[in-house]
Amino acid sequence: MTADKSLFIRAMPFLFILSWASGFPITRLGLEYTEPFTLLWVRSAFVLAIVVPFALIVRAPWPHWKEVAHIAVVGVTLQCLYLGSMFSALDGDVSQGVAALVAGMQPLLTAAVVGITLGERVTRRQWIGFTLGFAGLFIVLSERLGIGAGTMAGFMFAGLTPIFITAASLYQKKFCANSDLRIVMIVQQA
């Protein structure tokens, strides 16, 4: 492995955190100039402009069409339903703190239903971890939890976010767990 490649691989987690953490501020800024689903389209186009050339260069293997269909179901659930609800909540003047806290319930919701949906057992230790994680999220966001002037529709959209991301996560784990992430990103954004 070359030094440049090694540096890039070591930097990837930090680049991911930077891109993920910038999501709320960039979304809030973008919603000042455009509608939620237009912003989602721009976001998807940006991701595709980066990922498609990369996947072509590395010759990422294209899966069978049945697997593509499963990946597309996850993509619609994540990109349209989850992010569409999140962007609509923020557009409905729900504070970023409240939206993040509600969406942050996803691990708890997933743990609550993973036994029923996938037959997996959640241990006491995992429950403690999920609870501590949610408590940490609450503490970090506590100063930004002002309910503010959010609309009823905005709060309803925020309430849907953990449901949609949980559904997408469980479906992906069941049907797309071994899919090539480069192709997953392309199909989910398309």
What does each model-identified segment do?
Residues 1-41, 149-174:
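Glycine-/small-residue-enriched transmembrane alpha-helix faces in small-molecule transporters
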Residues 13, 66-75, 122-134, 154-155, ...:
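Cytoplasmic-side transmembrane-helix entry/capping segments in multi-pass membrane proteins
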Residues 19, 23-24, 52-103, 139:
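Specific transmembrane alpha-helical segments of multi-pass solute transporters/efflux pumps
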Residues 23-34, 46, 83-94, 102, ...:
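Juxtamembrane C-cap of transmembrane helices in multi-pass membrane transport proteins
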Residues 38-49, 78, 87-121, 161:
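Specific alpha-helical transmembrane segments that line the substrate/conduction pathway
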Residues 51, 113, 122-144, 161-162:
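Hydrophobic transmembrane alpha-helices of multi-pass small-molecule transport proteins
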